[in-house]
Amino acid sequence: MRSYMDGGGAAAYEEEEEEVEDDDGGGGGGGGGGGGGLGEKKRRLAAEQVRALERSFEADNKLDPERKARIARDLRLHPRQVAVWFQNRRARWKTKQIERDFAALRSRHDALRLECDALRRDKDALAAEIADLRDRVDGQMSVKLEAVAADEHQPPPPPPPPPLAYNSKVVDGSTDSDSSAVFNEEASPYSGAAIDHHHHQTPASYDTAGFTSFFAPSTTLTSSLSFPSMFHASSHFDGHQELLVGGGGAGAVADADLGGAGFFAGDEHAGGLSWYGAEGW
């Protein structure tokens, strides 16, 4: 048994068609003997009828009794044929809709899966970078802690040496350098102390006869030779005697007051310069 729809039909539609055909066959038999062959005639939908039903389905896939009767009247079909066609068309439409929805969902799922994989790779890369940075920070912190620990265990540097004290010692208001200078002045044969000692020495300690004979008086040489710079009151003997006022004694002060002439105050000293030219001349 074939259905009235192009492209096949459902079992429910075939059962509905059988019921319609049985009704038609029974009606034909009751009408007369010649009408018995009508029940065996098969009806098929024309192409125009199929296009009209498609337009009606696209407009509204719901089929109420009034609309079913109007479509059947316009297409010259039985109302039950119209109802079965709409039922089968809704089933195919639902199947195609499910297939379209499934394809869309599957494509969306694939896109989300790819995006999820990309996000997972990014997450793994970021986690590896974070771990690397954490290792670097831990290494730097460990190095700093080791340096701090080494600084703590290292003994402190020794204190700097104290500044060297000045070695000169002040004794009675004068330093060692001043004392050494005074000592050198006193040890010098030209110092005021030596001159004073020589001037005040007793005649018993000298060979007076030999000394006077050695320094024989020579009036000509004495008168011709003069040493103003050597025996002048402003000579360097005065400077030494002034420096040694505290240690040269009263004789040095007396010689300084005499303007340097105290060294050769006596006649024997004044004539003592004859040896410069007594024998050489």
Curated annotation (Swiss-Prot):
<feature type="region of interest" description="Disordered">
    <location>
        <begin position="1"/>
        <end position="46"/>
    </location>
</feature>
<feature type="compositionally biased region" description="Acidic residues">
    <location>
        <begin position="13"/>
        <end position="25"/>
    </location>
</feature>
<feature type="region of interest" description="Disordered">
    <location>
        <begin position="149"/>
        <end position="182"/>
    </location>
</feature>
<dbReference type="Pfam" id="PF02183">
    <property type="entry name" value="HALZ"/>
</dbReference>
<dbReference type="Pfam" id="PF00046">
    <property type="entry name" value="Homeodomain"/>
</dbReference>
<dbReference type="InterPro" id="IPR017970">
    <property type="entry name" value="Homeobox_CS"/>
</dbReference>
<dbReference type="InterPro" id="IPR045224">
    <property type="entry name" value="HDZip_class_I_plant"/>
</dbReference>
<dbReference type="GO" id="GO:0043565">
    <property type="term" value="F:sequence-specific DNA binding"/>
</dbReference>
<keyword id="KW-0238">DNA-binding</keyword>
<dbReference type="GO" id="GO:0000981">
    <property type="term" value="F:DNA-binding transcription factor activity, RNA polymerase II-specific"/>
</dbReference>
<feature type="DNA-binding region" description="Homeobox">
    <location>
        <begin position="38"/>
        <end position="97"/>
    </location>
</feature>
<feature type="region of interest" description="Leucine-zipper">
    <location>
        <begin position="96"/>
        <end position="140"/>
    </location>
</feature>
<keyword id="KW-0371">Homeobox</keyword>
<feature type="compositionally biased region" description="Gly residues">
    <location>
        <begin position="1"/>
        <end position="10"/>
    </location>
</feature>
<keyword id="KW-0805">Transcription regulation</keyword>
<keyword id="KW-0539">Nucleus</keyword>
<dbReference type="InterPro" id="IPR009057">
    <property type="entry name" value="Homeodomain-like_sf"/>
</dbReference>
<feature type="compositionally biased region" description="Pro residues">
    <location>
        <begin position="155"/>
        <end position="164"/>
    </location>
</feature>
<dbReference type="InterPro" id="IPR003106">
    <property type="entry name" value="Leu_zip_homeo"/>
</dbReference>
<comment type="function">
    <text>Probable transcription factor.</text>
</comment>
<dbReference type="GO" id="GO:0045893">
    <property type="term" value="P:positive regulation of DNA-templated transcription"/>
</dbReference>
<dbReference type="GO" id="GO:0005634">
    <property type="term" value="C:nucleus"/>
</dbReference>
<dbReference type="InterPro" id="IPR001356">
    <property type="entry name" value="HD"/>
</dbReference>
<keyword id="KW-0804">Transcription</keyword>
<feature type="compositionally biased region" description="Gly residues">
    <location>
        <begin position="26"/>
        <end position="38"/>
    </location>
</feature>
<comment type="similarity">
    <text>Belongs to the HD-ZIP homeobox family. Class I subfamily.</text>
</comment>
<protein>
    <recommendedName>
        <fullName>Homeobox-leucine zipper protein HOX8</fullName>
    </recommendedName>
</protein>
